[in-house]
Amino acid sequence: MDLLERLGLGGRRVLILHHDDLGLTHAQNGAYQALGLPTGSVMVPGAWASGVKGEDLGVHLVLTSEWPAPRMRPLTEGESLRDEAGYFPEGLEALWRKARAEEVE
């Protein structure tokens, strides 16, 4: 039995709204709670990740910190995942140049 059948929606088209980037800011978390969306994904290195509560939350994989603020740091000691200031690299090109597979895993 697939998810839609378990929800009593078998054979129907449905729209599932998913709140992305939870944990990045307090405002993101507040919007998620206020809107009551059914699903979301948490950016665990985000400064507000511990404030996210929900039953159907996934993990948003974070390996870059592309915005000037807020910047995010790796939760591990992986040096190849850090820029000179200790944050994730700003973009994919910088990540690919430096990242070591064993630290990404």
Residue ranges with predicted function:
Residues 14-16, 37-41, 54-60:
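Structural preference for beta-strand elements that scaffold enzyme active sites
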Residues 68-100:
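Active-site gating loops and adjacent loop-to-helix segments of metal-dependent hydrolytic enzymes
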Residues 14-25, 93-104:
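Active-site mouth loops of central-metabolism enzymes
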